[in-house]
UniProtKB/Swiss-Prot annotation:
Subcellular location: Cytoplasm
Protein name: Eukaryotic translation initiation factor 3 subunit F
Region feature (Disordered): 308-345
Pfam family membership, one: JAB
Predominant cellular place of this UniProt entry's protein: cytoplasm
InterPro entries: eIF3f (IPR027531), EIF3F/CSN6-like_C (IPR024969), JAMM/MPN+_dom (IPR000555), MPN (IPR037518)
Length: 345
């Protein structure tokens, strides 16, 4: 989904803004985390049938120089939109923002998102609110992230900042020039494994996928590497045989990749690989052993509680019977005393 287009930034406010009140429009790079995209897509799936798009707030971190913004989390904001007006629940947005910032003090407000690629007057109104002073991102620009969620089409993502425009101050309040900025979707190895597991269920009718074990994941990774090596070998052979056009950039990339390969003997590589396999097997065995012990411990604890409850009820019944027996003996003794008194009388 990431784009590699070039961008030209014109950092000049065009509206009648007071000195020191215009947000900066310096070039920046936007980094999007997968969990933020999943949250946006989930919000889009849960929208009302009559809503064309939904909006929400973007939270993340900003570099010290302000040239890079990381979008880490999001939350939905309710709004209603008609042909001539838009209403946004700003009070809810402020309360949710305060709660999120209290739970994650390192994160800040970085912008807002919409599940539509369209940029209109309402988009400018919302953008000016998020980039304004006080509750907005001022003096930093607010990032507007658009995620296209049309059924049957690929998910398209765009990132923008804005510059104020307008002949008068009244027109500048509901106007903005959206400037596209470069972005990238950044994820780690753990997130990549999760994304691959989710993508595996894309073509399954039940939308369910099995979670691979460590050995299966390693096997899949080795197969992917072998497949890539095979494709590169075929491409190099076709270039040598003049069956495919040569690419200087691709050749330089392959040369740099080969230069990163460690200069070791094949026997050493095989030994290290086997040692790694043994480590993975040991970790898998220990994990399964711990899981079995936990299940056994839970079952023993449940059985002990069950047996303890039954024995407790039995002891209570016996104690009650003993108290009843004592009461019976007391009654018999009092009857005998009364009989003796009557005989003396």
């Amino acid at each position: 989904m990431a784009e590699t287009d070039s961008f030209l930034h014109l950092a000049r406010p065009l509206g009648p803004m007071a000195v020191g009140s215009a947000p900066t429009t310096a070039p920046l790079n936007v980094v999007i985390h997968p969990q933020a995209l999943f949250s946006i897509l989930d919000h889009s799936l849960r929208r009302n049938a009559d809503q064309e798009r939904v909006i929400g707030t973007l939270l993340g971190t900003r570099s010290e120089d302000g040239t890079e913004v990381e979008i880490r989390t999001t939350f939905a904001v309710g709004h209603t939109e008609t042909t001539d007006q838009v209403e946004v629940d700003m009070e809810y947005q402020k309360q949710m923002l305060a709660l999120h910032l209290k739970a994650n003090p390192k994160e800040v407000l970085v912008g807002w998102y919409a599940t539509s690629s369209e940029l209109n007057t309402f988009s400018a109104l919302i953008q000016n609110f998020y980039s304004g002073q006080g509750d907005g991102t001022f003096p930093h620009p607010a990032v507007h992230l658009t995620v296209s969620t049309e059924p049957g089409k690929d998910v398209e993502t765009r990132a923008y900042i804005s510059a104020p425009v307008g002949v008068t101050a009244e027109r500048a309040a509901d106007s903005a020039a959206f400037i596209p900025v470069p972005y990238e979707i950044r994820y780690g190895e753990t997130e990549k494994s999760g994304l691959e597991s989710i993508a595996a269920a894309r073509d399954v009718e039940s939308r369910a996928a099995n979670i691979f074990t460590d050995i299966e994941a390693l096997e899949r990774a080795v197969e992917e590497v072998l497949g890539m090596i095979d494709r590169v070998s075929k491409y190099v052979e076709s270039v040598i045989d003049e069956e495919a056009p040569a690419s200087t950039a691709l050749g330089q990339f392959l040369l740099n990749a080969l230069a990163l390969a460690p200069k070791v003997e094949p026997a050493d590589i095989e030994r290290d690989f086997n040692n790694h396999i043994q480590d993975v097997l040991v970790v898998s065995y220990l994990a399964n052993t711990i899981r079995t012990q936990m299940e056994l411990s839970n079952r023993l604890a449940t059985a002990q509680l069950t047996l303890g409850g039954e024995s407790g009820n039995a002891e209570s019944g016996q104690r009650g019977g003993q108290r009843g027996g004592k009461g019976g003996r007391g009654g018999q003794q009092r009857t005998q005393d009364r009989s003796g008194e009557e005989a003396r009388a």
